[in-house]
Amino acid sequence: MEYNYTHGGDVYRNPIEYDFSINVNPLGMPLASIQAAHEGIVLTGRYPDYRAEQLCRAIAKAQNIPADRIIPGNGAAELLYALGQTIPGTALAIAPTFTGYAEAVAAGGGEMSYAGCEDADGRAADMDGQDKLQFESETVIQRLLAKLDDSICLVFLCNPNNPTGTLFTREQILRVLAKAEAMQAYVCVDECFLPFLEEEASHSMLPYLTKHTRLLVLRAFTKIYCMAGLRLGYLACGDTELQSRIRAKLQPWNTSIPAQLAGIAALSDTEYLAKTRENLQAERAYLVPRLRELVAEVYDGYGNFLLFRDEPDLKERMLEVGVLIRACGDFEGLDDTYFRIGIRSHSENQEFIRRLVRVKGDTKWQNQS
């Protein structure tokens, strides 16, 4: 049976020049991490530290959390799958959100329930009566709380949410956590995109880890440090007993020596994060108004990506001009008129607009950069 791959980044079967389907850092992997990974290759004749203790200590220092609460993994995906196997049953997530949660839950034999929008099409009327998805954070949290009952064993909350860009406050997440604790459910907050934001320090749930045993926080080097091909992530766990059960689902030596060394090097490069956030702010300001002139609707949230609506065949038409974008019809609550692009470097974003103009036949932006 053929594997049904629905995520972005499939450049291997799509001959393209520009990949806007993934949300990795356009600055590329930090130079120190590249050098560390090269040094790690020389050491690959030995087994990696199966505990990844040096990496865990580096993460603990950077995030001010106990090193013994950190579970390293071969990217966030491996940790999600281990979590799905450890806590089988019914999980709850907002809709739309990252499709990997449902895949991990299904692989563990569980079921996914969604707190979606108000009608069957995933749309609700806004204050002006227009047909529009409701992505505002408090609206989403209210729907999630209404759906959370004692049938739920695990709640996933992506912050900021992929693909909508909705950013949730600590107060909102703590309300979800309080109800989940009362229902004996766990809450996994996915913060893989949070380091892209200046708001990281005020929105991360990592400081609450030791106070709430039902809290888990998922992070990855994949997106923020552009290590998608190297694979490195971690799950911070408030419950030490649950942590042991999750570890039991993982293979030994699941993080390579090059990945461990690259991760340690990345955490020491604070200038890289500052440059990343500066680039994102500038390029979001460049892309949003231009996209709004060319597509049906743009949802300007947080994170290094943009969700928008247009004609269903836009992905195929963009492939014809050498650009891969993420079609979002497989996201719960969205249809084939929704698309997502990663926010790239300025030159790449300029080229994206030029090629979108070519596809749309719109000359308004033809001579603008």
What are these regions (language model features)?
Residues M29-P30, R214-V298:
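PLP-dependent aminotransferase class I/II
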Residues A120-L197:
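Active-site phosphate-binding strand-loop segment of PLP-dependent enzymes
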Residues G108, A182-M183, H212, L294:
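Helix C-cap/helix->beta junction micro-motif
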Residues P48, A60-A82:
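Short loop-beta-helix segment that forms the pyridoxal 5′-phosphate
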Residues M1-R46, D128, N367-Q368:
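N-terminal "arm"/small-domain region of PLP-dependent enzymes with the aminotransferase-like
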Residues E320, D330-S369:
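PLP-dependent enzyme catalytic core of the Aspartate aminotransferase-like
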Residues Q281, E293-G322:
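Conserved PLP-binding catalytic core of the aspartate aminotransferase-like
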Residues G84-A106, E111, C117-E118, K132:
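Conserved PLP-anchoring active-site segment centered on the Schiff-base-forming lysine
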